[in-house]
Amino acid sequence: MPSPAASRASVRNLLRRFRRNRRGSLAVEFALVAPVFFALLFAIIETAIVFFAGQVLESVTQTSARLIMTGQAQNAAYTQAQFKSQVVCPAGSLASILFDCTNGVYIDVESYPAFTNVTINSQIDGSNNFINNMQYNPGGPGDIVVVRMFYQWPLFVTGLGYNISNLSGSKRLLAATAAFKNEPY
């Protein structure tokens, strides 16, 4: 049976060795920092993807507005659904890969007699819900036309104190607008 002095010495030696041993401290430190690091990383990635999707929507809006401005959409007699499926989101396009074109892309095309008559209302109501009152009126030669496209982008990194949603249901409304005067086609 060891003496009490010997057991105290062995406890002291054990504590001394424990203080000197640094193995595993990196794992503990990483476990403390990792959740914050990954939350920040995912928030940055999600923000970048939202900006990229917004830029794609802007590009698609400009391209499809050009078809209206030159009269090609009017000559083809597109309906709103045909315009969306054949011009905005044709199969294999980046927009058709990135967006849910069937149910998620909203197109609003309105024509006016002059730029002073143009009125653009918000598509978000007081309860942060999307207002779907889209029209398709590409106008005729010389008309002022405003083309707006919307997409409700779902967000995933919202519960970590970083929330860029502007719609209910953790969604961000992406919007792109083009205003122009139709050419005399």
Where are these regions (language model features)?
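Short, conserved structural patches
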Residues: 1-8, 63-185
